[in-house]
């Protein structure tokens, strides 16, 4: 049998992208892993030395680390969960035919394409306890009598930043789910109508099963992105007040700003491992489904 000639052309096409990925992802990750095993404080460059697992031990003994990790879990669960619910509803609405649907679709993408830094600043002004628009609206609706310093109180700051990240992420869920909805054959719904299926039955028997993979990959991406998000929280509260909005990624960023790169790198590696525990089971499940 004649051997198939090795074709180098596809590898040449992929090589530039792989080189870029190696430069901007692989090398920094390896560097971060190396720093996590060192006492790497840029304020004391002469004291940089290998300390083995000392940074990791210190991290696990840090009460603020565990508080930030718990805040990260709440941040992801409520942030991504609400994004999915509202995004799913928006996708169902945009999948209907109505006048001006194209304009509504375009406008609905504005939160997603707006930079996170700008979103953080914009919502911080809206939440402002002195001249924020939310206080003005609530007063006109006679819901409050005195201004509420939303971002200065520990009991309101965290819900406020969650509302912001939900607003930002709804369009992404809506866009991805809408693409999945448009790929569902109309014959399935026609057959369901003939069988007398209700709207709820069609939703749970046809719609959701048909876009299950789309929902899962979209949710996975958002979990990773939201868990790693720094810009929105940092520009709104910087993790305060009293660390009430400090997620692990914000804690890492704040720690890196103190130039303690070894400690910050150790926390970053731990966060990456935590996210891997979410991503790997999904990938295994996906590969098993493809094999079946």
Please provide the spans of the model-predicted regions:
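A structural signal for multi-pass alpha-helical bundles of membrane permease subunits
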Residues: 2-292
């Amino acid at each position: 049998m004649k051997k198939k000639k090795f074709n180098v052309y596809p590898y040449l096409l992929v090589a530039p992208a792989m080189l870029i990925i190696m430069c901007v992802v692989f090398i920094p990750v390896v560097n971060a892993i190396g720093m996590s095993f060192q006492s790497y404080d840029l304020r004391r460059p002469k004291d940089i030395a290998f300390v083995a697992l000392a940074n990791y031990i210190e991290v696990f003994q840090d009460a603020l680390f565990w508080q930030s990790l718990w805040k990260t879990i709440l941040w992801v669960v409520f942030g991504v969960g609400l994004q999915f619910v509202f995004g799913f509803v928006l996708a169902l609405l945009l999948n209907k035919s109505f006048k001006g649907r194209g304009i509504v679709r375009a406008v609905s993408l504005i939160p997603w394409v707006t930079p996170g830094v700008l979103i953080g600043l914009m919502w911080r002004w809206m939440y402002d306890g002195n001249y924020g628009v939310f206080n003005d609206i609530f007063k006109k609706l006679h819901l409050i009598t005195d201004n509420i310093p939303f971002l200065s109180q520990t009991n309101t700051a965290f819900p406020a930043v969650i509302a912001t990240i939900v607003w930002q992420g709804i369009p992404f869920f809506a866009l991805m789910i809408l693409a999945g909805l448009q790929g569902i054959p109309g014959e399935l719904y026609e057959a369901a109508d003939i069988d007398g299926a209700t709207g709820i039955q069609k939703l749970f028997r046809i719609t959701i099963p048909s876009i299950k993979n789309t929902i899962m990959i979209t949710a996975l991406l958002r979990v990773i992105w939201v868990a790693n998000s720094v810009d929105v929280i940092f520009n709104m509260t910087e993790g305060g007040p009293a660390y009430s909005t400090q997620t692990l990624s914000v804690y890492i960023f704040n720690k890196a700003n103190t130039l303690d790169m070894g400690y910050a790198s150790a926390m970053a590696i731990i966060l990456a491992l935590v996210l891997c525990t979410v991503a790997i089971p999904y990938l295994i499940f996906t590969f098993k489904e493809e094999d079946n």
